[in-house]
Amino acid sequence: MITELTDLKRNLELISSRLGQTQDYLDLPGLKAKVQDLEQCAAQPDFWDDTDQAQQILQTLNETKSQLEQWGIWQQQWQDSQAIVELLELEDDQALLTEAETTLEQLQKELDRWELQQLLSGPYDAKGATLTINAGAGGTDAQDWAEMLLRMYTRWSEKQGYKVHLAEISEGDEAGLKSVTLEIEGRYAYGYLKSEKGTHRLVRISPFNANGKRQTSFAGVEVMPLLGEEAISLDIPDKDLDISTSRAGGKGGQNVNKVETAVRIVHLPTGLAVRCTQERSQLQNKEKALAILKAKLLIVLEEQRAQAIAEIRGDMVEAAWGTQIRNYVFHPYQLVKDLRTNVETTDVGGVMDGELSDFIEAYLRHSARLDS
């Protein structure tokens, strides 16, 4: 108990220091003043005359209040743990010790997450994300791999508390998917998932090979911010768009749509293309596809570099040998390794079940070091 109590005190001191740094960074008096100003603004009689501006103000107000509330929770957790330590110095109590250890462990994780979010300072990092997976080299195995990645990113999103909506899906010839697009709604979804763009390589014994041979497959991942008014305000001349329609649905049977509701839009100057199939009408799919296309163009404009498109779009790089960002080896051994950060794990099952935090965090810290 003495050793455990000593460790608990040490953790308490470390977290106290981190909380002090966090308090300075947040500028609590400034946040409180900001809340008062925004509340006064929201109370004005003409507040709703400009609906868009009013919604932006309310969003900022809610986010600022959330920061203050989060700080209050952290402070209370630390104070509760401090009180338990004082009690433990007077009397041994294993249950209280366990409670304090659990509270501090959770507090450390929350501070880690908050500190990581401070690395997400890009103009669209706080937005939701549009994530597209395209099967690459590897035939049916690659299409199956694309479907496996769909599940992996869906599970990761659900664990973060994000909402996932299927925007487009194109089924494989025999199994799996040729392509799929997800809309992931939640704060910082784009900031986290932008680390996933690129080519993902799978090595395994192919379930589609009668001889049980080892197969290498590839899939490309593209990530864009999920934008609202920012994308709508971007004007694209009609002459720059090639819009085509087709039937949506699977390989056959009742799921095939007999009406041409699927929409594909190509931005002719850049070659950027978007396909949307999941809405009920052609008009809805067209609006959805155009919104995604505008988001892609905004990111390209934001980059303002000669090779902006190639760098910002994961599917612009051929999903094949030599282009991968991460290897997933299922056979002859089990290992997932990120080639950019060298972070690796043998817990292949956990990764495929959405345990991506170690890879994402390492990449964000790696990128921050490069930028600095």
Curated annotation (Swiss-Prot):
Sorted UniProt keywords: Cytoplasm, Methylation, Protein biosynthesis
GO MF term set: translation release factor activity, codon specific
Domain of life of the organism encoding this protein: Bacteria
Biological processes annotated in GO: viral translational frameshifting
Primary localization class, coarse: cytoplasm
PTM per Swiss-Prot/TrEMBL: Methylated by PrmC. Methylation increases the termination efficiency of RF2.
Job of this protein: Peptide chain release factor 2 directs the termination of translation in response to the peptide chain termination codons UGA and UAA.
Similarity-based family: Belongs to the prokaryotic/mitochondrial release factor family.
Name of the protein: Peptide chain release factor 2
Gene designation per UniProt: prfB
